[in-house]
């Protein structure tokens, strides 16, 4: 989302669409990963202690969920940042400065999707529409409809997913289905992931 990352079709859409919806009188929440190239000091990010502190387990490893927030003053919008030192600290979006894709991009996407959903639960917010943008949010729709389907925050939510280009050049590591497993999902829900 601009101004936190450089301008691209996805970052501009992530900035302008929520503002437009908010200006039409709707309540919005905007989330994005706290990429390593986002300057916390310049953008005035600060941790939200009441939302942070949970651990998410991915592939039998605990990963602390840290929630930060900043405001886009000109739009009167808050942006929530999903953060974790293992997945986002000192790391760019898809690949490092030399163009090498991160081997754990799948786990980063799982962590981000689950982090957003757990934060929405803690906020006790019931969104009518959840608009997922790009590869990082790809797991959110499946989790909402299968693993979080009885959760009051998501029971009546509709999910829209927008894709943007093909950022990946290398296939996802084998075993993605096992890493994405959550209570409420069945193996058949994840079998398609193992062939990616």
Residue ranges of each PLM-predicted region?
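Catalytic cores of nucleotide-sugar-dependent glycosyltransferases that transfer UDP/GDP/TDP-activated
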Residues: 1-196
């Amino acid at each position: 989302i601009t101004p936190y990352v450089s301008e691209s079709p996805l970052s501009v859409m992530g900035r302008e669409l929520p503002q437009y919806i908010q200006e039409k009188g709707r309540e919005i929440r905007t989330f994005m990963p706290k990429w390593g190239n986002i300057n916390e000091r310049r953008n005035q990010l600060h941790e939200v202690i009441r939302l942070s502190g949970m651990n998410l387990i991915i592939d039998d490893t605990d990963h602390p969920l840290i929630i930060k927030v900043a405001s886009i003053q000109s739009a009167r919008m808050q942006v929530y940042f999903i953060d974790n030192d293992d997945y986002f600290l000192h790391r760019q979006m898809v690949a490092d400065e030399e163009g090498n894709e991160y081997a754990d991009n799948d786990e980063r996407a799982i962590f981000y999707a689950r982090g957003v959903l757990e934060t929405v639960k803690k906020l006790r917010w019931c969104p009518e529409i959840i608009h997922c943008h790009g590869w990082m949010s790809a797991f959110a729709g499946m989790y909402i409809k299968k693993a979080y389907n009885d959760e009051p925050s998501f029971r009546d939510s509709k999910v829209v997913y927008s894709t943007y280009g093909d950022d990946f050049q290398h296939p996802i590591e084998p075993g993605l289905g096992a890493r994405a497993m959550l209570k409420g999902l069945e193996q058949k829900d994840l079998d398609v992931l193992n062939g990616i």
